[in-house]
Amino acid sequence: MTATLERRESASLWGRFCDWVTSTENRLYIGWFGVVMIPTLLTATSVFIIAFIAAPPVDIDGIREPVSGSLLYGNNIISGAIVPTSAAIGLHFYPIWEAASVDEWLYNGGPYELIVLHFFLGICCYMGREWELSYRLGMRPWIAVAYSAPVAAATAVFLIYPIGQGSFSDGMPLGISGTFNFMIVFQAEHNILMHPFHMLGVAGVFGGSLFSAMHGSLVTSSLIRETTENESANAGYKFGQEEETYNIVAAHGYFGRLIFQYASFNNSRSLHFFLAAWPVVGIWFTALGISTMAFNLNGFNFNQSVVDSQGRVINTWADIINRANLGMEVMHERNAHNFPLDLASVEAPSVNG
């Protein structure tokens, strides 16, 4: 009898926990994805803050020349970063217990792997939580689909690119100047500016910004006035009201006369689908481009491709970009190698003795 009561008590306790996790009445929805998301994102955030402030220098290139990234070791907010895991570790899974000591783990950049892997799990679970809440509320799943674009971008630079290059040391540093360094080196090694998928991503981001600004300004300029001229137009509305707050026909007419008729939408659903799809598809393409360049399927290279009838090179902007790429490549990791591979004219001598 006692065992039966205990089983019922535990079952009801588990049932109450399940109801609480999946309840849409909570101020913040938890969800089953949230059960994983909360600890992983808290871990990533906590380790990031501690490491950004106090982590010792990391031997990123695996050549016993550690690079400082934390505030206590001479950096500021702009120059500081979580330095990627050492090239000596490569793609090995490197938790704290795999190192001989905590000092060794810090020296080899263990915090970077810890942060990136927990962050990746966290953002994937956040995307799943968006779908889960939409499902509970009877909504369509497109919010999670839109969020998949930044998830794909983060996955590309933090996971796919290091896997393709063979080491977490090639991942993007977690800091402002570290991000810029990653971008410059990426251009030098992969000519990303000449990759069509990057061009689509630029069109997606800048186009999305332009369309959002146009949409917001058109909506706020075509509000349906519910007040007198002596009162603010904002006083005529309440949050969540069923009636429309702006006149899409007026906005459509204005924009159609400003550009041409078919440049504007007269259907609200089509308009908002376009506003969502344009930047999302652009960022999807950028993430796909990073993922292909991770395996050295690089941007277009027109190096010395234009010649005259005598065989002399006619320099183009593409040649100038290539020269800039070579200059950037010889500047980075200057002590890890003597020359970049594409500047070496002969094979390296044997070191077997």
Curated annotation (Swiss-Prot):
Binding annotation for [CaMn4O5] cluster: D170, E189, H332, E333, D342, A344
Entry's Gene Ontology cellular component terms: chloroplast thylakoid membrane; photosystem II
Modification sites for Phosphothreonine: T2
Stored PROSITE patterns: REACTION_CENTER (PS00244)
EC number, UniProt record: 1.10.3.9
CDD domains: Photosystem-II_D1 (cd09289)
PTM info: Tyr-161 forms a radical intermediate that is referred to as redox-active TyrZ, YZ or Y-Z. C-terminally processed by CTPA; processing is essential to allow assembly of the oxygen-evolving complex and thus photosynthetic growth.
Site feature (Tyrosine radical intermediate) residues: Y161
Subcellular localization, as worded in the UniProt entry: Plastid, Chloroplast thylakoid membrane
UniProt remark on cofactor binding: The D1/D2 heterodimer binds P680, chlorophylls that are the primary electron donor of PSII, and subsequent electron acceptors. It shares a non-heme iron and each subunit binds pheophytin, quinone, additional chlorophylls, carotenoids and lipids. D1 provides most of the ligands for the Mn4-Ca-O5 cluster of the oxygen-evolving complex (OEC). There is also a Cl(-1) ion associated with D1 and D2, which is required for oxygen evolution. The PSII complex binds additional chlorophylls, carotenoids and specific lipids.
UniProt binding sites for chlorophyll a PD1: H198
Topology class, membrane: Multi-pass membrane protein
Residues where chlorophyll a ChlzD1 binds: H118
Cleavage, annotated site positions: A344, S345
Segments traversing the membrane: 29-46, 118-133, 142-156, 197-218, 274-288
NCBIfam families tied to this protein: psbA
General remark: 2 of the reaction center chlorophylls (ChlD1 and ChlD2) are entirely coordinated by water.
PANTHER family: PHOTOSYSTEM II D2 PROTEIN (PTHR33149:SF12), PHOTOSYSTEM II PROTEIN D1 (PTHR33149)
Family stated for the protein in its record: Belongs to the reaction center PufL/M/PsbA/D family.
Protein name: Photosystem II protein D1
Species the sequence originates in: Chaetosphaeridium globosum (Charophycean green alga)
Gene name of the encoded protein: psbA
